[in-house]
A protein has these predicted regions:
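N-terminal beta-alpha supersecondary unit
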Residues: 1-63
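Short glycine-rich anion-binding loops that position phosphate/pyrophosphate groups of nucleotides
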Residues: 11, 64-65, 117-120
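A generic structural signal for alpha->beta connector loops
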Residues: 20-22, 86, 108
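Buried hydrophobic packing segments
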Residues: 42, 77-81, 98-102
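DPxDG-like acidic metal-binding loop motif
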Residues: 60-94
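Surface "functional belts" at beta-alpha junctions
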Residues: 88-149
């Protein structure tokens, strides 16, 4: 499988290429610079893998929660690329992706990922490890006062 994924909903900007079991990524902590960084990241990943966009199987993007502008950047770019290359698109919860990383790197059965929502609040959710090893949301993703979490 060949999958390109973008994440721009937080202060970090990243693009990753999953190519037959191997992951290559570009990552930069760069608040408010995502619109300048993400396209060169995509170009770099595809060039390094000697791939053209139409050779991918699908595109994915972090659907948030997170920065409204950041989510729109990734969603807009992915939708435009997908339309032009006739590729399917998969939106992925940013919190679920964070929980999945916890499960990949530990034996933990639960993860509580949090993202700064500004103004003293956080986006968060409780995830449990499913029987298949995948992050399963328990309840719903919410925004709450940081002191309540």
């Amino acid at each position: 499988m060949k999958l390109l994924s973008l994440e721009t909903s937080t202060e970090a900007c990243s693009a990753a290429l999953y190519l037959d079991g191997e992951i290559t990524e570009r990552y930069q902590l760069a608040p408010q610079q995502h619109n300048k960084l993400i396209l060169p990241m995509i170009q770099s990943l595809l060039a390094e893998a000697d791939l053209k966009l139409h050779q991918l199987d699908a595109l994915a993007f972090g659907r948030g929660p997170g920065s409204f502008t950041g989510v729109r950047i990734a969603a807009g770019i992915v939708q435009g690329l997908a339309f032009g290359a006739d590729l399917p698109v998969a939106p992925v919860s940013t919190l679920a992706a964070m929980a999945q990383e916890v499960f990949a790197e530990s034996d933990s059965q639960y993860a509580l990922p949090c993202i700064d929502a500004r103004m003293g609040e956080v986006y968060w959710g409780v995830y449990r490890r499913g029987n298949d090893g995948m992050a399963k949301l328990s309840g719903s993703e919410v925004v709450a006062d940081a002191g309540a979490v």
